[in-house]
Amino acid sequence: MPALDAVASAFSLPGADMRSLAIGAIVAGLAALPLAAQPLEERLPTCFACHGENGTSQLPETPSLGAQPAFYATVQLLMFRDRLRVSEPMNEMTKGLSDADLQKGADIISKLPPPQPVADTPDSGRMERGRALAEQHRCNFCHQSDYAGHENVPRLAGQREDYLFKALRGYKDNSRYAYDAQMSDVVYPLKDGDFADLAYFLARLK
């Protein structure tokens, strides 16, 4: 598929360019296909091209999906299909799929291995600041003590650092739709520096 070839070539580019080219290629490629007639199984390779076949995304600001709770993944896919969340590649990818298809896709996602955390020597100061913020704002109350998520609450451990930062900022400025408004309340008093420390901490958890 030309879109997949373009995604593959995008991985040789720097961050922002890589993401822009990959998303542009996918949108263009999907627009040229009779997508509503395409079964879920034929769409999965394109899903994995961006989100990672092994559960760990290599594409900037694109989430790793490995080990996400099936219920949470189902809700997000339903929201993309019904355009309650707007992201053109995801809106196109889920177009025409039945509820059962989306549940099947979510089940596949939930069985992918957990994403690999950032492999570096963590900055102890940033890790401690991130841990303290997570405890202060009781992130582990909903996301579980190991931040693996549960039911309708997403896994955060090992998620891409840049994606976590983007999502947290999106909740604060209301550019990211949250079906649980509690997230907007939690992040309201936080600053970009706090988001950066939280993302740094969570991305390095196994």
Task: Walk through the language-model features, giving the residues of each.
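Bacterial N-terminal signal peptides
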Residues: 22-32
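Protein kinase-like catalytic domain
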Residues: 51, 81, 143, 172, ...
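Gly/Gly-Pro-rich "capping" loops immediately C-terminal to redox-active cysteine motifs
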Residues: 40, 55-85, 91-97, 131, ...
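C-terminal capping alpha-helices of c-type cytochrome domains
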Residues: 95-117, 162, 188-206
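Positively charged n-region of N-terminal signal peptides that target proteins for export
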Residues: 14, 18-21
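Sequence/structural segment immediately N-terminal to covalent heme-attachment motifs in c-type
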Residues: 36-54, 117-118, 122-145, 160
